[in-house]
């Protein structure tokens, strides 16, 4: 990933985020933009750097995370997992909003993100603007509360730009 090809907001904020001070301060990072602009790549890069710096990091896609939470609830081991989740310095949740969730999944996601608010850091990658978070959280009140909590003192990184994959595909087609 060529940093110079990232959207301008990402180019400006990446040096700040790379210090990992946001983890020390319990701040969140929201990487928001269209597909193929490097959101997951940046999130994973920050996660790897955090691991190498001695932080405990958890990564999951939101759909798999919700499925895991539902399974843990059904086996009555959710509280044990929540205790472990609270100990991670950084949780990275990828693909927020790519797949909508049912009410139970939305409530579980809300509860488990709320536990961390203001204390531990979470990175979320999403292709949805905040006004569309209600599509994930089926309840508009829950969507508003989640947006309020997750964005409080957060770094918002606008990742809207041209898709790297599409750019590579066009290049490949020209060469073929």
Segment roles from a protein language model:
Residues 1, 43, 61:
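Conserved hydrophobic/aromatic pocket- or pore-lining residues that grip, position, or stack substrates
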Residues 28-30, 90, 121:
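Residue-level preference for the first positions of well-ordered beta-strands
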Residues 1-20:
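N-terminal pre-Walker A segment at the start of P-loop NTPase domains
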Residues 26-30, 46-69:
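Conserved post-Walker A coupling segment in P-loop NTPases
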